[in-house]
Amino acid sequence: EPRFETGGAVTRAEIFVYDVRHRTLAGQGPVQTTITPGQPGARFDLSALGNGEGKREPVYLHASGLEGDEAAGRLVYRGPCRMVQGRNILTAGQFELEQRGGRFSARDKVRGIFFTRDGQGKEQRFEITSERMQYDPERREIRFEDQVRTRTDQGVMSADTLDGLLREGGGLSELVARGHVRLNQPTWDATGD
């Protein structure tokens, strides 16, 4: 089975085509990448979105195809795409990983299911959907854009944009919703901008 290793990750596919002149890589057929936490270069960590749930577990990326550009340090996974770490799951039509900065983006029907803990330590399922997502681990910031919708045990919220600041070690520190914000809870509703 063809495979390549880079930056703490192992990627397998049915076929890899490497263009030496342009330094690009294409993976075809089912593509799977395994990122092992703690390995040199293994900077992406899905558990940061869910209070560190599954932090020591590998990140698995599954896609239909892969395009890599060595000079740009970028890998683009084409869909349908699925990423799993522990019980945390992220799906989208496309994933893009910047290997040098560890930044990550997803687009086209982004859906994430993350497990967090509230102030009393009670586990809570946090589901979010949007059209685009950007994650910057250096700044510990995440942004969901376009048709954002979140669902928890406490209710449903929709907005144009949702910005999150992550605590060091994982978990959300702050969420800021902007643009056509609507909050629905069992006992009341609210709207705002």
Where are these regions (language model features)?
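Mature-chain termini and adjacent capping regions
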Residues: E1-D193
